Amino acid sequence: MKVLVKQLMSKSLFTINLDTTLDVALKSLNANSIHRLPVVDNDGNLKGIITDRDLRLATDSPFLPENNEDRLEKLRLHKVSSIMKQNPVTIEDFSPVVEAAKLMRVTNVGGLPVLDKKGRLIGMVTRSDLLDLLIKVLEPVPPQS
């Protein structure tokens, strides 16, 4: 069974701009119940990725105040571009899913931005997507009566 990334990826994509402040990124992650946001320029080109972990590390700094509102205020002072991972690991939409799994395992990332043949961002594939596929493949099929 050969499954391609394009068959598994999420096409409803949330992205964030380079100039967005960290507080807005945090709110976007929380509001959409997601763990990573591709960072794009004004033309929609992928420039980086920011994760909930990146933001947790930024907000858990001993240099920030204890009060959450004060922490958010400090995050308003910094742009996504200041902490994003540049040149994130990506995969093409026509790649086999097994390649995505290997790439995630080797690079220790929880999700990959998916690019088309022209290098445009068109989706995301995550560990959860891979686990859902694994469950579907391994789950016994009930006998037909």
From Swiss-Prot:
Pfam families: CBS. It comes from the Eukaryota. Keywords: CBS domain, Repeat. SMART domains: CBS. Signal peptide: none annotated. Residues 9-66, 84-141 form the CBS domain. Gene3D superfamilies: CBS-domain. The keyword Repeat applies. Transmembrane segments: none annotated. This is CBS domain-containing protein DDB_G0289609. It comes from Dictyostelium discoideum.
